[in-house]
């Protein structure tokens, strides 16, 4: 039996559309067990409620990621039980799909005898996810700058330390990335491009130097947040409430609808204010206070292969 623990991520961070991602101390866990039977069993446990959910295998993203690798090596998997312990809300802009893809690929790779190195698995994950800014920080941890040149992936990781607190305000409704991409403009003005690339460089410097006081300017954006936030009632008021109560930076997390804010101290006051602001628009939400993750994917336990040999 082995367990893969993978952190939540906040992609499109501030001005860094499809290029900047941040790893958070909120985790999904995937535990693989060998069965004596030939069955494949997949169960999902919601950490908040303790509820156990069983989805049809074909609808499970981690299963599809596993099968992508098994089919590549012409292996028919049998005798596997997978328990997913889910703490990351689905379709809220926190990288839940990236954890499933990485969990499936790394789990399958272990059961195949580890034919692929981490970097090879990462390239496959980016291909399946279609963009790198969730999967790379989920695997590597930290603050990550990602560049795609054709199918080639380049990235740099910054360790932002553990001082900064993260407050996630998570509305009850879901937004899918595919739908949210449709509201983005096909073209932008030159001045908006300059606005964003200057702040992308500045935000990277802020995380490198741990200059949290400058995050408010560095997190500004004209590429995606103004368009996507139009689908999130109360977004502007939620952002204002966070700043009014001590946040040093606020942005849309991923494609939304989660709003991520940063603070140098405990963030209860910020979280409560954000929830209250959403409430003014009859939207139920909750907040989670957490920290920054610098480790990324972690594997624990006793590996086994489908050939029957355990290591």
UniProtKB/Swiss-Prot annotation:
It is an enzyme of class 2 (transferase). One of its GO terms (molecular function) is ATP binding. ATP binds at residues 89-99. Keywords: Amino-acid biosynthesis, ATP-binding, Cytoplasm, Kinase, Nucleotide-binding, Threonine biosynthesis, Transferase. It comes from the Bacteria. It catalyses: L-homoserine + ATP = O-phospho-L-homoserine + ADP + H(+). Its EC number is 2.7.1.39. Pathway: Amino-acid biosynthesis; L-threonine biosynthesis; L-threonine from L-aspartate: step 4/5. Pfam families: GHMP_kinases_C, GHMP_kinases_N. GO terms for biological process: threonine biosynthetic process. It is found in: Cytoplasm. One of its GO terms (cellular component) is cytoplasm. Catalyzes the ATP-dependent phosphorylation of L-homoserine to L-homoserine phosphate. Belongs to the GHMP kinase family. Homoserine kinase subfamily. This is Homoserine kinase.
């Amino acid at each position: 039996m082995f367990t893969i623990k993978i952190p939540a991520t906040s992609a499109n961070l501030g001005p860094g559309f499809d290029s900047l991602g941040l790893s958070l101390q909120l985790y999904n866990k995937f535990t693989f067990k060998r069965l004596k039977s030939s069955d494949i069993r997949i169960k999902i446990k919601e950490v908040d409620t303790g509820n156990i959910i069983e989805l049809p295998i074909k609808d499970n993203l981690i299963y599809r990621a596993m099968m992508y690798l098994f089919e590549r090596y012409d292996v028919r998997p049998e005798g596997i039980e997978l328990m997913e312990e889910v703490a990351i809300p689905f379709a809220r802009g926190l990288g839940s799909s990236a954890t499933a893809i990485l969990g499936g690929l790394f789990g399958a790779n272990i059961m195949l005898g580890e034919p692929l190195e981490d970097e090879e698995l990462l390239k496959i994950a980016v291909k399946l996810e279609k963009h790198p800014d969730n999967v790379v920080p989920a695997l590597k941890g930290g603050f990550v700058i990602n560049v795609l040149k054709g199918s080639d992936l380049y990235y740099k990781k910054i360790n932002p330390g553990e001082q900064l607190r993260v407050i996630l305000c998570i509305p009850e409704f879901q937004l899918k990335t595919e739908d949210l991409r449709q509201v983005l403009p096909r073209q932008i003005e030159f001045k908006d491009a300059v606005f964003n690339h200057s702040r992308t460089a500045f935000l990277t410097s802020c995380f490198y130097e741990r200059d949290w006081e400058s995050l408010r300017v560095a997190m500004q954006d004209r590429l995606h947040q103004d368009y996507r936030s139009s689908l999130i009632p109360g977004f502007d008021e939620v952002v204002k409430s966070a700043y009014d109560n001590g946040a040093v930076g606020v942005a849309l997390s991923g494609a939304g609808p989660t709003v991520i804010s940063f603070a140098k101290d405990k963030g209860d006051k910020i979280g409560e204010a954000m929830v209250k602001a959403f409430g003014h628009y009859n939207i139920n939400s909750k907040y989670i206070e957490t920290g920054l993750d610098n480790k990324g994917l972690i594997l624990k336990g006793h590996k086994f292969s489908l050939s029957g040999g355990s290591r």
